[in-house]
Design a protein with these regions (language model features):
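Long, Lys/Arg- and hydrophobic-enriched amphipathic alpha-helices
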Residues: 1-128
Length: 128
């Protein structure tokens, strides 16, 4: 991340993923957050079927936030994905919701509804 953010370029960085702080991981997931998915099915056997299943784990936001600050980003903020979209793309969301495009509306709901990705994913952002 330090290499990606280096070089003195100006602009915004937006990282969207699901994650926790280290304290949240230690308290709520002491065995870790690594999971495997094969054919859209959750598996606890993360070392089996290597190459034919997806591996995933939570991002540690409190390890990434200081990197943004050290690289000169300001207004560094961690928000739930739904709040991030409402704050930064509210008018675009409104256009989608009133467009009559059922597919687009469904995708937007999946990204922002708290029962779907809205509460599970977060956005870490900063500007320089």
């Amino acid at each position: 991340l330090e290499r990606l953010l280096g070089g003195g370029w100006s602009g915004a960085v937006i990282l969207l993923d699901y994650g926790k702080t280290l304290a949240q991981c230690l308290e709520g997931s002491p065995a870790g957050t690594a999971r495997a998915y094969r054919s859209h099915q959750l598996s606890g056997a993360i070392l089996e079927n290597l190459g034919s299943q997806d591996l995933t784990c939570h991002v540690l936001w409190d390890r990434l936030e200081p990197i943004l600050v050290a690289q000169g980003f300001r207004s560094v903020r961690l928000e739930r994905q739904e709040a991030f979209f409402v704050k930064h793309a509210g008018s675009a969301m409104e256009r989608i919701m009133t467009s009559g495009d059922n597919e687009g509306t469904g995708r937007l709901r999946a990204l922002t509804h708290p029962a779907h990705f809205g509460a599970k994913f977060q956005g870490l952002s900063g500007i320089r």
